[in-house]
């Protein structure tokens, strides 16, 4: 077996949490067992995806589901499905779609680097609205009528980045889009927990919703979920699966795709680069069952205790420690370490850099460094790492 050390790497203390750049969330033993079991057996992938999709549909309250190669892959596949449907010619031409509708309307304030996944399928964005609060120009944000005003014969759909503060409200956007027969693709990659979002976002009327499988669900980091309308999920599936078969032998389960809707056998679609292994499907489905049943809830108290250990070890340092979060939020508690930069003579960025460069390397949450605060998330830490982390931070704070 090849280890990280064999490759010349030193494993870090991940005090950041389930972020992609550090490898995602820890997979529970049952998820790892499912992955290994899947590795030793073989099934047709269209049958596996059909069965998994039925269970995803049950848990999300949607018509159909698909296991994808991450939430970004869900967005690319969802976009491709909206652009093409079951039109084999369009499927063949992606990402070149100049001769059919390919524009997605999006709130200007919801643009991000992640929406490259939508553009990768060939879509073009039409931006609407302003966040005049952020620009210090007023009190208004994007409003639903602005979406509708941007709809033209070139509009294929609407893209919406879901969050607790997203504006305008998703139901208002959906209502405007559906007036014109336009589907709405929702990016909800990081919106789990709470568990209820698995079904509540789609219940608002979204046509397709994408979730991450390697964060709160704690499946393989390279997995995600796409769920929603049966016809769109079916289109996404045939643009992802291996289509190297004879037409008279290809027999996908009707729960996945109705062959009668196809004029022939598609060639490999744009989603072929986003394939998912059988092991990943089994592992993701195992993790999804654990997540949706609340099996992870009992870990909150253990995580809180780790943070208490870290905070106690930093008593008397040039920092103030505050444990944030509640069990009701269904998220791991976090420890905010507000550094007295004047007393220390170093900035939070300096401390963060020192933690990464030390032994063992430590990666902390960096979202509040500009405010002089380190954030510790215990999700990816073990109990024996808490004292070591406290020691390392203490060293950087002058101890």
PLM features per residue range, with description:
Residues 45-50, 64-66, 247-250, 294-303, ...:
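Flexible, glycine/charged-enriched surface loops at secondary-structure junctions
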Residues 81, 392-399:
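C-terminal alpha-helix
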Residues 267-270, 290-297, 374, 379:
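Glycine-rich phosphate/diphosphate-binding loops and the adjacent beta-loop-alpha structural elements
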